[in-house]
Structures are given as C-alpha cells and as structure tokens.
C-alpha cells in the first residue's frame, strides 16, 4: 500500500512529461467519492489506459484494476501493476475467487476499474460489451461511472507526446444496475450493456478531437490567352 502512494505521484509526473492530458467531467468523478461502492467502466485502446485513468482518479483509497493474467508474466511489469492496484484474472476460466474478492472490496467503498470490452480495440472503436462489470456492480450494489479515453493522434491510438482526453460521464446509479427479475436476467444484462455503450459512444461524439484540416489543392495556374494576329 505504501508503494502505491510512492509510485502514483512519480507516475503522474512522468506521464505528464510524455503526454498532454485534458480531463473533462471531474464533477462526475466527485459523485463517487462519498464512500459508496463504485465501478469505473472505461473503453480500452492501449495497455497504459488503466495507469492514465488511475493517476487521474487519484482516490484516497487504492483503486483496484482488473487486468488480464498475461500482463503479469513479466516480473517487472507484474510488480508495477500490483503496486498500482491491479489484480490478475484468468480470462475464460470462470475465475470466481478474484471476482468475489473484488466484489467484497467494492462493497467496502474501494473503486474497481473494469474494462467492459474485456480486451483492447486498437481502432479506437468500441468492441463488444461483456457482462463482468455489471455482475460485480450488481453484487456490490455499486454505481457505475462510464469513462471514455480518447487519443488525439491521427490513427486514434496512443503515441508518445500525443494529446490524451479522459472524459468522465454521468453516473449510472446502482438502482439501475440491479437484476430485478432473474427469469429475464439476459434481457436485463442486455439493457445495461446497451445503456453503457450508448453513454460511451455519446462521450466520444461530444468530446472527440477535431479532424485535422485538409489543405485544398492549389488551383492550376492559368496561362494568359494569346492574342490573335490580324
């Protein structure tokens, strides 16, 4: 825990040297800082997305990040991720132990970051929204905060020194994330996923970087007409 508070300011400084950040919707972020359970649900483009969002949230409790197990195979990367609050999950294997651990921490007011797509989409477009974030939010009675991370590069991907825009959307209250009718569980989950997708798409539509202006091709120079000889 101590390493988290040592590393976080260092990472913040390094990140602000290498990239140019703009944060929008801080007032929406403040709504989850009252001790309530909350789940942060961002889109996912680059491996450093969780780090960028973590240094932006800078919560007084350590933010927990759900990350794929493969990222921990490198000893140095694994150490860094654990210090930053990341928890490894075995994808596709029904890792109920990790899910239960995160749910219990979330109930106690710890923020949980889960990428609802479950993987990166390098094009910047949203992939398929999965159910994991909603399962934990429903079990913990947590609010959900949609977050859109937008890279200001030509291809929409992360590059050194590019602009990065992190947009916090409007809170989705816990009451709207409860599965009230278990006989229609799949339909309820589909409704929630569509709601989150709509929120994330709207955040991009409202806050996308302006497309670079295309220079008009110069008009061909017209030669003076020759006068006719008598």
Positions of predicted regions on the chain:
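Catalytic core of membrane glycerolipid acyltransferases/transacylases, capturing the structured
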Residues: 32-93
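Non-catalytic C-terminal accessory region of glycerolipid acyltransferases
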Residues: 97-230
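Short amphipathic alpha-helix with an adjacent loop that forms part of the alpha/beta core around
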Residues: 28-33, 103-104
